[in-house]
Amino acid sequence: MNGKIIKGIGGFYYIKTDQGLIECKARGKFRHKDIKPMVGDDVTIKMEHGKGVIEEIHERKSELVRPTVANVSLAFVVFAVKNPDINFDLLNKFLILCEYNNIEVIVCLNKIDLVSEEEREEIKKRINVIGYEVLFINAKKGIGIERLEEKIRGNITVFCGPSGAGKSTLINKLSNKEHMETGNVSVKLGRGKHTTRHSELIEVADGYIVDTPGFSTLEIKDLMDKNSLKYCFPEFTQYNDKCKYRGCLHYKEPNCALKEAVESEKINRYRYEFYVRALEEIIEEEKNKW
């Protein structure tokens, strides 16, 4: 019998099948091979003495670490436009994580009533220019929900973003229930409390959504090596093979096509500077390993 893991708690996995939801444990062989079932996994299960057992985990199309979710095909990166202000460094980190895992990204900007139309367009332009679609939403008022449902259809969609951006409120709207506790934003800090207890797939609009377990502490240097980073910036693609030196990191090498594009304002300088900072962190991390 085949199904999909929609929830995992304490070694038990809840599999959605044609025969309903079945609670399962994983075969010991997975533990011996250091393989752990993940929410989002497509699996084959078997009933033994009235209890479900996971026999096979099908090949994963993608795999996230934070949150621990498999087969995600779309990511909504949720940020508030105000309260708190957008942290573009953190936004870049989320974008890189998604790119590294080959997951399509849509940036969702919440609390749109807190800024003017002019400010919204300026933010949208800044994100569009690096290759990402932007949707404006108001999670509390339900503005933009239908657009999100259109995108969710046929996908496993993950929501990521900082605490206080409105992810839990948004998921409550989409799932039509108080699926998770929603932390109030601290007036002093302007940040939400860590409230999400675990990852779980929720069926919405002929697709699935999964929330991150609160806010993730992302470290790019732990995700990839120095040669992989440049491929996580879509706007760099057309320049990666045009440099004088093969394997150019777009860092200190001469005759670099990307650096020339930055100087001629074809590439956003802020994004390039962020790339350099991230690259230097990776290089330093690699030095420390040896």
Swiss-Prot record:
Residues that hold GTP according to the record: N110, K111, I112, D113, G161, P162, S163, G164, A165, G166, K167, S168, T169
Gene this chain is encoded by: rsgA
Presence of keyword Metal-binding: yes
Known partners and oligomeric status: Monomer. Associates with 30S ribosomal subunit, binds 16S rRNA.
One Gene Ontology cellular component annotation held by this UniProt entry: cytoplasm
Annotated binding of Zn(2+), by residue: C243, C248, H250, C256
Domain CP-type G: 61-218
The keyword Cell wall biogenesis/degradation is assigned to this record: no
Family: Belongs to the TRAFAC class YlqF/YawG GTPase family. RsgA subfamily.
Single GO molecular function: rRNA binding
Cofactor(s) of this protein: Zn(2+)
Stated name of the protein: Small ribosomal subunit biogenesis GTPase RsgA
Compartment(s) of residence: Cytoplasm
Function description: One of several proteins that assist in the late maturation steps of the functional core of the 30S ribosomal subunit. Helps release RbfA from mature subunits. May play a role in the assembly of ribosomal proteins into the subunit. Circularly permuted GTPase that catalyzes slow GTP hydrolysis, GTPase activity is stimulated by the 30S ribosomal subunit.
